[in-house]
Amino acid sequence: MKSIYITGYKPYELNIFNNKQPEVRYIKLFLQQKLKEYIEDGLEWVIIEGQLGVELWAAEVVIRLKKMYDVKLSIITPFLEHHSKWNEENQLYYNQICARADFITSAHNDIYRGGFQFRNTDQFVLDNTEGTILFYDDEHEASPKFFKQTLIDFASENQYNIDVVTLEDLSDFVNEYMRAKEY
């Protein structure tokens, strides 16, 4: 697999209100381990749509991994200026990530016009990647549930890899990580 899309929860959906919260560190460590496995199997491109939360945390991980691996980061936003209504801190954070991305574009060369832009971008990304890592748990419903159904429908008609990460997967990882640190 050469290209993968990563998406999932927004920070507030996980009760995360600051990137310095310890949960963010564990999510990034988990994503780093997962991405290393994909990179060692031939992954070249990681694609995100530039949303706060799992997507930008994954972007941070990719930027770190670029120092050791030949992997690239692409940001394909649904529309122009998608981050313009974010607070100043989040805009700065986003711009710092964009400065290190290998490719940035918008699926729609226009400002926000409607929800169709998100659906069209999701479809474009699915059509142009070979798999998705979806950080989502049916036990903890939130915004990714809509994409999950689109993803399942797409994969049922196409040869496409789905890697769903649940909160239990993350919890298991954290427990193993903590045990390993004890030794």
From Swiss-Prot:
Domain of life of the organism encoding this protein: Bacteria
InterPro entries: YspA
Membrane-spanning segments: none
PANTHER family for the chain: UPF0398 PROTEIN SPR0331, UPF0398 PROTEIN YPSA
Family: Belongs to the UPF0398 family.
Matches recorded under NCBIfam families: PRK13660.1
Name under which the protein is recorded: UPF0398 protein MCCL_1095
Organism, as annotated: Macrococcus caseolyticus (strain JCSC5402)
Lineage: Bacteria, Bacillati, Bacillota, Bacilli, Bacillales
